Amino acid sequence: MRLDRFTSKFQIAISDAQSLALGRDHQYIEPVHLMVALLDQNGSPIRPLLTILNVDVTHLRSKLSEMLDRLPKVSGIGGDVQLSSAMGAMFNLCDKIAQKRQDAYISSEIFLLAAIEDRGPLGQLFKELGLTEQKVSQAIEQIRGGQKVNDQNAEELRQALEKFTIDLTERAEQGKLDPVIGRDDEIRRTIQVLQRRTKNNPVIIGEPGVGKTAIVEGLAQRIINNEVPEGLRGRRVLSLDMGALVAGAKYRGEFEERLKSVLNELSKEEGNIILFIDELHTMVGAGKGEGSMDAGNMLKPALARGELHCVGATTLDEYRQYIEKDPALERRFQKVLVDEPTVEDTIAILRGLKERYELHHHVEITDPAIVAAASLSHRYVSDRQLPDKAIDLIDEAASSIRMQIDSKPEALDKLERKIIQLKIEQQALSNEHDEASEKRLRSLNEELNEKEREFAELEEIWNAEKAALSGTQHIKAALEQARMDMEFARRAGDLSRMSELQYGRIPELEKQLDLATQAEMQEMTLLKNKVTDNEIAEVLSKQTGIPVSKMLEAEKEKLLRMEEVLHKRVIGQKEAVEVVANAIRRSRAGLSDPNKPIGSFLFLGPTGVGKTELCKTLANFMFDSEDAMVRIDMSEFMEKHSVARLVGAPPGYVGYEEGGYLTEAVRRKPYSVILLDEVEKAHPDVFNILLQVLDDGRLTDGQGRTVDFRNTVVIMTSNLGSSRIQENFAMLDYQGIKEQVMEVVTKHFRPEFLNRVDETVVFHPLGQDHIKSIAAIQLNRLANRMEEHGYPLEVSDKALELIAQVGFDPVYGARPLKRAIQQSIENPLAKSILAGSVLPDKKIQLIVNNDQIVAHQ
């Protein structure tokens, strides 16, 4: 008997039977071994056959195990296992049956047919189960669908639809699909195309996240509810699983063979099946090797003839990139465009999905949370589509609330840690016997008892609240199940069951839920069971970094005292500080224009007066870190072509994939301070790019993505007019300086650029008093740096006045002061520390001696 006459599945089963005999110390491979191997095989071809024949496979398997146990065992045979004479006779019988049926190969089901004719114990068992040759032959015909076994892989290609597709109508019947709200026009258009005689293949096109797959799920739900035209009633919607189709196709042509078997089975169904191909573009080029066809080309004939009812779904970009390049494939599909829903439509969709998410997370989702999710995601998440981004917010907010319920509340956790800490201290003190330790131990025991009592009370409250929450959850789950049962009864036409549920079980559960909810409504101290708009805002803030949550009292207080905080570091610039503070307050109060940046400012004035320092202080105030500022030195953008560095190189140029310096920074941190330093040094064309940012708060990068600047503060600094200030400094007051500077600025910048800037602020030149205050700030920083190295520093008033005098230069601002501190204080101190003349941990005083600042210890 040649092994290559068997199908590949049958060959694997024979190898498994050999292993089974070897493992059980049997000398011969009997038909029972092979039958067990066939039943245990992964993707067994025998199991579906026995299911059709109404055989209890588990009962059969246990009977076969008993037969194996009765076979004689021979120990120490050294791994020599042979085919028994019964097995040889069985194979010959299989060959005879295969020839009779005109099969080129012997398949697994032929062995079952031969086993029934067997006079041995296996044949006897099948007779007891009521199997006859006629019954098995009919079942084989049903499974094969009239096909002969002309290929070694024939068994793997059988029931291709079950293996390579997912039945959406079946899932809809089981209530596993989410409800589809709205989208009536798109579903109607899809049905309209499916009803055509030829080219009845809609392709649903839209941006990622607008609900393309949901439309097909909606179609499946309408089919099972009989809400479709006569022509589509009773149809099945099958989703093609491309992963299963490609997985394990090792040899050339195997993928095509699988796809062909799917198409053959579809054609046999004669239009009763609608095939849904999600990510349709994956079909173009799938399975393409040198000289072989791809899946897209194999689909074309069936699509054109109208044999295959196919619904595709893909994004706009991928449709253009893959489908439109193949006009022959494109003309076979009819486009159904799906737009992003409006905020109002999204709210309706979320209300429909609300119950599913409540049931999954075991929390309650309030209506304000739904409205907030739709409106906030629409405003602040610009690079994704509704309703997907709004559903994400609801899902994550519900998940965070659930996590708080399941894990210990923060108050309880802190108390537990404190008790552990006190117990460790108690253990350490119990070994000490001096008076102080005993006194401390007594007070510690009192504190520990107090904390443990507090912990016990809180834990009791927590457990009671958890129990209350889980009670409502069980009722909600039962109510959902009752509603699903009612839907099944409606479809089955079981009126008595429907009335029992509608007028008995469901109202009773709703009443129970009301009572449980009222009990739960009593103010909970530890747990929250509701997703409100606050939770949605918190999740959005974590995702994007944009503060949209309601302000706490501390933050309101901080914003009202913003000028005070900024003035601690920025000296003598009242107007500039006020302008910036007002812009931030407008934004946080929600009054700023939603289509423009939070604020855009042009800071002008002489060098060294605090223009850049104000930006750093603002970033520090808003984000507690100066690094949160996106700083771009415009002196690097002097050439015309360097503009591309800001938004990214255009296609075809080197660096296209990398993205722009400015756009990438803002995409990662949508809420930030952008500082364009020394803006007048840049090429004039750079300002053309800034026009869109300042006016509409948006910019398109080199890859065509729109970057949102609406949550940024744009600050530009410039030294324009500083030469005039130097020339006329002694003669002019602040108003005169401002006029001179503005004259130069209006000549240099275009009017459309200046007109778009919210505020143009000219900084004051610094006076002697300002320099003294700045000197105090600078010396304080120096003292902090020295403190870290163990050298405490104290500066006398005279030393402060002297350094302020030395560092004062009305033209150059505060920068000469920095140099003066370096030369007069830092350099001598560094020498003293290295020489060892000043000692660590001993105060160093800076005093004035002969108009010189000296360090004294």
Curated annotation (Swiss-Prot):
Major subcellular location class: cytoplasm
Job of this protein: Part of a stress-induced multi-chaperone system, it is involved in the recovery of the cell from heat-induced damage, in cooperation with DnaK, DnaJ and GrpE. Acts before DnaK, in the processing of protein aggregates. Protein binding stimulates the ATPase activity; ATP hydrolysis unfolds the denatured protein aggregates, which probably helps expose new hydrophobic binding sites on the surface of ClpB-bound aggregates, contributing to the solubilization and refolding of denatured protein aggregates by DnaK.
Gene from which the chain derives: clpB
Coiled coil: 391-525
SMART domains: AAA, ClpB_D2-small
Subunit structure comment from the entry: Homohexamer. The oligomerization is ATP-dependent.
NBD2: region residues: 555-765
InterPro entries for this protein: AAA+_ATPase, ATPase_AAA_core, Chaperonin_ClpB, Clp_ATPase_C, Clp_N_dom_sf, Clp_R_dom, ClpA/B, ClpA/B_CS1
Swiss-Prot/TrEMBL keywords: ATP-binding, Chaperone, Coiled coil, Cytoplasm, Nucleotide-binding, Repeat, Stress response
Chain residue ranges for the region called Repeat 1: 6-71
Name used for this protein in its record: Chaperone protein ClpB
Region (Repeat 2): 83-146
Pfam family, one: Clp_N
Residues reported to bind ATP 1: 206-213
